[in-house]
Amino acid sequence: MTKYYIVTLLLLFGVTNKAQAQFGFSHEIGGIMGPVAFQSDYGERNDISTNAGNTGFGIGLIHYLNFSYKAECNCYTPETYFNDHFKLRSELSYNKTELQHFGKWVDKSRTSLIANQLRGMRGSTSVTNIGMQLEYFPLSIRDFTSTIGSWAPFVSLGGQFSFYDPEAYSTLGELDTPLTTPVKYLGATTNQGGTVWSIVSSIGTRYKLTELSDLMVDLRVQYYFSNWVDGLNPDPKVYLENRANDWNVW
């Protein structure tokens, strides 16, 4: 089954912390939570039920280095374009998604062996991420910081290192046998966890609630350099619709 893009939102609530900071920069800390649409080898392309059904949940902690403000003197840093338009974000997050096949190939009207096997396939994956992103704010960070009720749109790009733990099974019996598993997935399943690098990119905006707190809405795409994160990996040379690696949208 192929991957299909879905738009979901990640809500973040961040509280800045003007404590003494290493290198003189101020720190911001916050928590993130929101739905995770996992694009995997489960489901069908261009199918709404696939995108809605294979959606999990993610939570995490984030930390920012704010280059525009010096914590030790409660004053601004020297005014440069970089200091006033960039922040460095580090993150520790966790997400889990329950997975199964959706779409016309598993419709109740289909009674073939393959349809029954697809309906019986189940899976899940848990992913723990740690990494960093560089966020770019086209508007002035200083102006945003000093103005309650203001907005600060941004884009970001970075990388993460992830620990994943997949589970694949069948309600019909032991997986990876001709009785329970479609030919496409024979020898292409695993319950073994692993590690993987990924690229992360996001677009969003902050809203200034108070002097020390922001609310952020963030749309993030994470692309893994592996097709095993979901526990399935059909031969991409034979099944071209499955040639893309796993990815998700927060």
Model-identified regions with their sequence ranges:
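Short glycine/proline- and aromatic-enriched beta-strand/turn motifs that initiate or cap beta-hairpins
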Residues: 21-72
